[in-house]
């Protein structure tokens, strides 16, 4: 008699644990197939940083500005990899809209040819003295203001040209005239007071003034400032933010003045370097009339070289004024000063002259 087999234990039946494992394997396979259409597993989570955070490629990009600090004196721009720049130079930063761009700075004036083949002092002095002793334009009305023409103007050193064609008389009458007076401790303010009384706004710069800014009358200011041919060194300026030495162009910017109808200067032998600075920085274009006292008994501050080369430099400066359309309308030889020319009693020259120019393009 055969024995009966227990249910589920036949040859065709599978163990329960094997069925469970097969079921789990099938579920895992379904999940893998579902993700197969969207790429490999986990690809969505492997994103890189946003493009805005990527570092720029080496070299400047067209139309973009580089955020880097450069020195003003550096005239070179960094080249991209390879050593050759293919990008046009970018315009200078922070140019004011609506204003013409300034020309590049000049570093020296153009020296005139020598007066003669021997390059001697006699040749240079003869040319120079003849130049400052000969007026280049006639002025029918000269004086210290437009109210009344001074008597005997040829005997006075500080005079302005009041011809209507140059516009100064009109500016004074309409109270729109501005005069800058540069000096070093002079007590003679007759010219400045007369111009202020006539209707001109006068700013007198003198380092000997006790207070920083003094208003003497309605139109006459005194400023404790000295005009130099260079600004203070940045290190000095940082320690002394109220230093009393400035270039004229810097003072014009600080005061917000765009034009000077008359510039008078008595700088005791600093006039040559100051005049050179006005020429090199194109400040002359902002000046209507120029009255300078020049000193000839020595070369002047920071003017060096042989005697003939010094006189050639002086002459070249005055020729630069002529190139800027300034014309000499009055010359005054001071006979009360020592009659010396570069420490020599020669050429019948005085050590001091006052020269007056008018800007013929001034409007």
Curated annotation (Swiss-Prot):
It is found in: Secreted. InterPro entries: Methyltranfer_dom, METTL24. Its main location: secreted. GO terms for biological process: methylation. Its EC number is 2.1.1.-. Keywords: Methyltransferase, Secreted, Signal, Transferase. One of its GO terms (cellular component) is extracellular region. Residues 1-38 form the signal peptide. GO terms for molecular function: methyltransferase activity. Residues 37-62 are annotated as: Disordered. Belongs to the methyltransferase superfamily. Probable methyltransferase. This is Probable methyltransferase-like protein 24. The lineage of its organism: Eukaryota, Metazoa, Chordata, Craniata, Vertebrata.
